[in-house]
Regions:
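N-terminal assembly/interaction segments in proteins that build large macromolecular machines
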Residues: 1-279
Length: 279
């Protein structure tokens, strides 16, 4: 198959590459006939919807002993986003991502569900567009491998509009990891600790403090600037934030208390939060 023909058909119709290739194969390389094939399949009407805004959706989630997978599936309305057909499709996408350790939307789109191997996932997506009458797009995918000696916590929130994930460097701490994942969703930390914050950001916060205290004596202004930086770190750093479960303790202090109670060494290996339409 001449890829330039596939590309030309894609540019003319707006239909995905996989569907274009299938249409050209059926049309034996005839471009105009391939367009007719796409029209008969309803793919063109689906493509016409592809420029409509997708401001709703659902984050599909799948997990096993080797890893976890997330897939953000977008649609136009919350009505469709809450339907079983839509959420099940997102979770099936996540399961394929998990089993295949998929790393991109493009790779996922060319795969198939095990129960319908004759149809690509891109074809299934187009069918769902036809069924719902909405623009439906796979926005992003992630496969997150698990490591030995770690504990993992996953927390889906607000109908899977947000999913928090925490990995702890310590086995047998799934409960704590889950509680910390809830915290990540609620407080949205950007960094693990002070050492992870870029120096230019810290300097900027300090300069803001000095500017706000410019009428004060230098020694007092310096203390105000230091306080400004501490407050900033308490807002954006995971370990510096107040614990959601124990507000009197920072997350770091909370983890240390768990270490004493379990006689284990616990540290945060990684964390992240996916939010619908987020980065």
């Amino acid at each position: 198959m001449d890829f330039s023909l596939v590309k030309e058909l894609r540019e003319k119709t707006g239909v995905g590459l996989v569907k274009c290739k299938e249409a050209l194969l059926e049309a034996k390389g005839d471009l105009e006939e391939a367009i007719v094939v796409l029209r008969k399949a309803g793919a063109l009407s689906a493509a016409k919807r592809s420029d409509r805004i997708t401001g709703e959706g659902y984050i599909g989630l799948a997990e096993n002993e080797s890893g976890l997978a997330l897939v953000e599936l977008n649609c136009e309305t919350d009505f469709v986003a809450k339907t079983a057909t839509f959420t099940e499709f997102a979770n099936r996408l996540a399961q394929v991502t998990l089993e295949g350790r998929v790393s991109s939307v493009e790779e996922l789109s060319q795969l198939s569900f095990p129960e319908s191997s004759a149809i690509s996932i891109e074809g299934e997506r187009s069918s769902l567009v036809q069924k719902t009458g909405e623009n439906i797009q796979i926005r992003r995918v992630l496969f997150f491998p698990k490591k030995a000696g770690h504990s993992y916590g996953v927390y889906p929130h607000l109908g899977n509009r947000a999913v928090g994930v925490v990995a702890l460097l310590c086995s047998g701490q799934e409960r704590l990891a889950k509680e910390l994942a809830v915290h990540v969703v609620a407080f949205a930390p950007k960094f693990l600790s002070e050492k992870d914050v870029p120096q230019d950001i810290l300097r900027q916060e300090r300069d803001i403090g000095l500017c706000q205290a410019k009428e004060k004596p230098q020694a007092i202004a310096e203390k105000i600037a230091e306080g400004k930086v501490r407050d900033f770190l308490a807002q954006v750093c995971f370990l510096h934030q107040r614990s959601m479960s124990e507000p009197k303790l920072s997350v770091s202090e909370w983890i240390k208390r768990e270490e004493k109670q379990t006689n284990a060494s616990i540290s945060v290996a990684s964390f992240f939060c996916w939010r619908l339409l987020g980065e």
